[in-house]
Structure formats: C-alpha cells, structure tokens
Amino acid sequence: MDSGRDFLTLHGLQDDPDLQALLKGSQLLKVKSSSWRRERFYKLQEDCKTIWQESRKVMRSPESQLFSIEDIQEVRMGHRTEGLEKFARDIPEDRCFSIVFKDQRNTLDLIAPSPADAQHWVQGLRKIIHHSGSMDQRQKLQHWIHSCLRKADKNKDNKMNFKELKDFLKELNIQVDDGYARKIFRECDHSQTDSLEDEEIETFYKMLTQRAEIDRAFEEAAGSAETLSVERLVTFLQHQQREEEAGPALALSLIERYEPSETAKAQRQMTKDGFLMYLLSADGNAFSLAHRRVYQDMDQPLSHYLVSSSHNTYLLEDQLTGPSSTEAYIRALCKGCRCLELDCWDGPNQEPIIYHGYTFTSKILFCDVLRAIRDYAFKASPYPVILSLENHCSLEQQRVMARHLRAILGPILLDQPLDGVTTSLPSPEQLKGKILLKGKKLGGLLPAGGENGSEATDVSDEVEAAEMEDEAVRSQVQHKPKEDKLKLVPELSDMIIYCKSVHFGGFSSPGTSGQAFYEMASFSESRALRLLQESGNGFVRHNVSCLSRIYPAGWRTDSSNYSPVEMWNGGCQIVALNFQTPGPEMDVYLGCFQDNGGCGYVLKPAFLRDPNTTFNSRALTQGPWWRPERLRVRIISGQQLPKVNKNKNSIVDPKVIVEIHGVGRDTGSRQTAVITNNGFNPRWDMEFEFEVTVPDLALVRFMVEDYDSSSKNDFIGQSTIPWNSLKQGYRHVHLLSKNGDQHPSATLFVKISIQD
C-alpha cells in the first residue's frame, strides 16, 4: 500500500538525493510582503503526491495544510515572481524559489536556508511533476487508488478492516450500502481474519477496477478469442475506430506501445489489458492525436487565422477593483494566447504603468510586463505574439515606453516591414519568434520618418478603456476627463507595422473594405453582433484581408465573457476574452485553440478565406460550407470523477451534457440521466443524435455536472473538441477542470460515429 515507494521505484528515484531531502522536509521562509516573512516547515508526504505545510492558523483543518503536486503549474528558481522581485531583493537568487499553481490561487514564494536546499526543492518538485506527467492512465489510476488506501488505513497496519474499507470507498467517490460493501469484503477476505491484506487487497483492487464495458468492446473486436490478433485489430481500427491509417503497421505499433505482456507482444497479439491501455492513451482519445501538433498551412496571411486573444490581460479578477499582475500575462501565454492587451498610463517616477484606467484596479510597471512577456512569449508556441497597446500616456512617458520596448524585447520586436511583405499581411510562419505591436500610428505602413525629439502629432484617442456603456458602471469609476485626441510620438508610432489601430468606417462597397491590409479596427461585442446581423457577408469578406479585434462590452465589469463562436462564424480573428474568468465561454475558446498543436493560430475554413464568398452565418444558403453530417454519441460510462465538495461524506451524483456550438441552426444540447452516489465508475449507456449542417464551424462540448435537486448543479469537468478533431469509435474523453487543467484520471468512455 506504499504508493510513494511504488512511484519512486517505478521511475528509478528511490535513492534520489533531491527527493530524499523533500521526504525529510525542511524549514523554509514563506514570503508575503516586505514585512511578512515567517519560518514554516514543508515536507513531501510519503505518497509523493502532496506537500504538507506548517500553519500557525487556529482551527485550521489537517487537509487544508496539504496541497497536491498535481496543482503545481511550475517551479521557478530565483526572483521570478512579483512577490520575490519586490520583497526578497536582499536575498541571493540561488536561495529563492516559487511554486506557481495552475488555478488562480496565490503563488507560494519561499526562501531556503542555503542554495543547496533551494536546489533540492526545485529539482525534486520538477522531477515529480515530470514523471507524474509521463505516467500512463493505468499507472495514474494505480497510484491514486494506493494513495486512497493509505488515507483509509487509519491505524497504519497495512491492513484494511471493514470500517476502513467503507472509508476507502468514500475516498474513491463511491457510496454503497453496508450489505454490498460487506459482500465485497467477504469475497476478498480469503483468510477470514476480518481484515484484508496483501493479495486480498490486490484482489479487491482488481474487482474494483474491472470494467464490464471494456470487456464487451474487447469481445466485439476479438470474438471468442482471448487475445486480439493483428488481423482482428486492423478490422477493429477500420470498422469501429475509422482510423484512416488502419493497417498492419498501425496495429503492430499499438501492440508495441500498449501491450503490457511481453509474451503477447512477441506473438503479435493484444490482451484485454493492452486493449484498455490503448483506449486510455492519446491514441484512444476522442481528440485527434494528429491535431496535437501543428498540421495546418502556416504560410497564409495572418487574417486567414483565428488568433487566441486575451482582453485586459493584466487583470486577475474583476475590472473595477481587482489586482493587476504580470502573472496574468504569464498564465495567458502558457495557455497559448497570442494577443495580449497592455492598457498604458502615466506612472510615478517617469515609469509608465498598466492598469484598467479610471478604476481602482492595482497598477504594475510597463517594463515588468515586457520582461514577463519576453521570458514566456514563445514557451507554448513559436508563432507571433501581438501586443495590443492602449496608449494613454504623455509624450515623455511614450518615449519611455519606446525605449523599454527596444531595450527589453530587442531583436524579437518587429519594428520594420518584412522584406517584400508590403502588399498583404505576412504569415505566422514568416513572423515566427516575433512580437508585433498593435496601436495608433502616424501615416501608413512605412515609418513616418520621425527622429527622437521630433514633433508629436495628434491621433484619435483609444476608445475601449473609456467605453462605459452602462450607467451603473459609470457611477463606479473615477471621473474621466473628456479627451478625444492623443498626441503620439514618432518613436512609438514607427514600431507599429502591420497592426495600425483605426476606427471602422464601414464597408466601402459589397465585398471590399475601405481599410488598408495593415489597418485593424476594434469592435465591442454588441457592435460586432450588430454588424453580423446587418451585414453578415460584408463582415466575412472584410475579415478575409483585414484583422478585426472584438472585445467584451463595457458593462462586463465582473470580467464575464461572451460566446466567441458567433464572432468566429463571421471570420473575426482576434476575439478577445477575459482569460482570468473560467466558464463555458472559455471552455469553448480553449477547446478551439487546442487544435493545430495548441499554437494559438487556427486556420479558418476555406469559405471564410475566399474574397468572393457568399457565406453569412445569419442567413445560411447552399454553398461549400453546407455539408450536413449526423453525429451519434453514446455516453457509456465515467471514470474517477472528482469530488466537487471536499466534505468527506459528499459523493457526486453525476450527469453528462453534450452540447453542439456552431452556427445558429446547429446549436443544441442533450443530457443523460443522473447516476446517484457514484463518481468512481458511473454507467449511463445513453445515445444521442445531432444533425449539423456546417461542421467546419462546430465544436462538441462534453460536460459533467453534480446534480443537486435544491440548488444549481455543480460543475465537475468538461472537454470541448472541434468537430474536425473528433475521432470516431470507442474513445475516452479526458476531462478538464473549470480552469482548463487536466484532471489526472477523470474520463468519459464514449462511442462516436459521424455519417454524411
């Protein structure tokens, strides 16, 4: 039952000095502010999955002193967070490190007593994170069940009595009556000692993890045989899984990768265990493995792609009083975001700052944001990053901005047109590794010829920060003086190349735009919807050659989001959402952008790239987009659905909702029945059917909720998959948390078929 030792042995880490130091634990200084540094004891638990942290808070529960390593986004060495940058400059960098979490909880900033101690923690945690990520689904399940066994074994005798068995089932998110639990217990208690140990626990584990629905799928593929031959596996891959590459080569490759039995592997056969391993793997995922890499043509103009874009990137919470943070930029970039917003204002000491103007959100230095962007811009994707500058600065501080941009970003800043690219937008491939600026500009594509100190020129002020559409919002913000014109210095203007901000002047004639290809208009969501309703096809044609940026309405002071789908249907590329706000809109957004290798650029369908297209999502007619398809989805079962309420006695009552997002006529949803008191292995076996007319614009969202008869259902997990990335046959849907992070073992087992 020692899951930690199993983990260390599995990965050859049992004698690793870094992990031995973490298992022993050490005193570290926790840093919260310039006046708050406290010594606390931190220790890796024996399960190698959790860290125990000492707390001096009164009445704090033991569970609240633990955090899971699965919740860690990354471990940073040195002064690499705002906290350590501000509050630990007096401490050498080689003693400082930070634990950054996946969700939006505060970063844990720590100071070790020596550089060696800091190295143990940083390297040890990185090793566990790396090896946990490389575990297959079976290993993750085994590790998780063993850790639940450890928790249930209250007296630590490596045996399990009946009460401990009941506690164990609760840990696994299963509620069973005493009679059924007693029946399982007796079946496994071969020694009749009223406790389970060693092989008896192993027998119990096998009974628990047996999946009848996998057995049925295996029998469907293998017939009466005990194993799957290469020929049978090829037939299964062709007829059930609809694999385009189905053939002996693929079958042998799957046997080689997933078959645990060396004997079966030598005989070129797949056992039931190997079959399950395949179905739980990336090859058995409902999301196409081929789409996990960049596979689309990246040599087309930028306007031909949807671009993952963030609104008010600097905010961690709401738009009126929430904190601004460089960490928000890092999080967005790590999620593949390629267009960030910088709302720039005059700051003290001649240093420009970023915050949500005329509100009480906190302020961060422009230069600090640039350093964070420089360090993280190309970690998740090599393709270009666009910085959307909302410039409200004085002339002097604009010059400071220009100096910082050149000094900090250096050669990665695009500050002149690419050779020969002066008649259309360059491609993502041409702009790889480059940062572009979007903002107000004097003159056209080429620099206006100004030198430092030359005369500034009036341009119209940025409008978005001032857009307060709702009276309730206006009453909550500080007084904003009326200011229609902004003076712009040439040093900053000349850095704007392919993304010159302009006011939209309307469509000059059907199918054409009055804008130059390097000019870019921004639209509030309400104005964009109005344009889509009144001139849907005109908007689509405009977006063939020009970039359009959409941002949330001014009344969304809570940082809520709008649906991006309608904007994408109109060909709009830079559809900016509040990345800090989880919810269905962000689920769909991140689902769309996991396509094409998660690089932040998704090629629009051909009919949204054709300058002569007649497509209009609000008035559908026949055309190349009209490809009716029928989707059948059978929701078979769920696996290891996480507890919503951490209360030990709470067991989830899950139900599954399948949604289609796309053009209006294709949108719909269906839901399963509720399974009571079982989050470990609920079974539904319910089939749904959807008719979709424009599959190129459709996404399928699988959502699991915990049903509550007296209040709103609680969200458990979801996965959103673009239609063209959806795989057919028996598949596992791997569920994500509300923040878009992978649940380690939570899946839905489904059967999918798509027919013309």
Curated annotation (Swiss-Prot):
Q: Cite the effect that the entry attributes to residue 440 to A.
A: No effect on activity towards phosphatidylinositol 4-monophosphate. Lowers activity 5-fold towards phosphatidylinositol 4,5-bisphosphate
Kindly list every residue the record annotates as glycosylated. Answer: 191, 193
Q: Where is the active site?
A: 311, 356
Q: Which residues carry this modification: Phosphothreonine?
A: 457
What exactly does this protein do? The production of the second messenger molecules diacylglycerol (DAG) and inositol 1,4,5-trisphosphate (IP3) is mediated by activated phosphatidylinositol-specific phospholipase C enzymes. Essential for trophoblast and placental development. Binds phosphatidylinositol 4,5-bisphosphate.
Assembly and partners are described as: Interacts with TGM2.
Question: What name goes with this protein?
Answer: 1-phosphatidylinositol 4,5-bisphosphate phosphodiesterase delta-1
Give the source species: Rattus norvegicus
Q: Identify the taxonomic lineage of the organism of origin.
A: Eukaryota, Metazoa, Chordata, Craniata, Vertebrata
